[in-house]
Amino acid sequence: MERRLFLYWLIMVLAVMTAVFVVLIVAGVFSNDAGKLGGTLSVQQKNTTMTFNKLIDTLNAQNLALSEQITREVSDVLETEERTFKDLDNNPELITRIEERMCFYLQTIVRSRSCSGAYFILDATTNTEAPGADRSRMGLYLRSGNVGTDGMANQYITFFRGVADVARKENIQMHNRWNLEFDIDNVPGYEILMDFDGRRILDSCYLSNRVTLSGTWEQVVLLSIPVVLEGKVRGVCGVELSELFFNMVFPSVES
């Protein structure tokens, strides 16, 4: 799966660089400097590959640590409340307790600037009788609210999915497309990861194709892994790489 992710982004980078190269040729900018530019592009490609490999290593480590942290926090909450995982359904208070416990960890990941968002989803819902409840799942999704040409120096976090009281408690700005829960039909790879056999988690990472984030115009790729509790998959977690974030980390080569 790592190889698939690497190839996906590398192809995108090379496509952008090739387009720039063609435009400059047509414009006659470097009729006598083609060799020099070719060398520049080669160096740029090598640097991009190195940067991307470092990014993937960071994301894999973050995803694994997040999955393990969710397992610990959920187990602790359920043990303290003398509940089972099935008791999360139709229990807004218990769901809120778990989301409060996990909010700090998601904020830490987003602030690390190694991605444009972080999320977790558990196989439970606030109201099993609500319309669409069979495809609705609890969880948190935090996103960076300042990814663009000016970088992330003035980064702030937006609350995209989760219990609104958690956002208020943590003083996090609500995303203008906020929803309480995830529609798993809009979460690439969710069903695949829920069928994970419970062995080595890193072997099950799932890289989505580029998709439009639900309710927005933004293009993103999601890198997800399972959340395992007592040997059974109980949800998924992961990070978001938006197109804006990608363009910031891997800028086009300048002439």
Identify the function of each model-found stretch.
Residues E2-R97, S114:
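Juxtamembrane extracytoplasmic/periplasmic/luminal helical "stalk" adjacent to the first N-terminal
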Residues N47, I98-C103, S204, V220-L222:
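Short amphipathic alpha-helical surface micro-motifs
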Residues F52, Q107-I109, V211-T216:
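Residues embedded in well-ordered secondary-structure elements
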Residues N60-D197, V253:
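Extracytoplasmic/periplasmic sensory segments of membrane signal-transduction proteins
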Residues R101-Y105, V236, E240-S255:
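Solvent-exposed, extracytoplasmic
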Residues T125, E230, S242-L244:
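Short coil/turn motifs at secondary-structure junctions
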Residues R161-G238, M248:
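Extracytoplasmic/periplasmic ligand-binding sensor regions of membrane-associated signaling proteins
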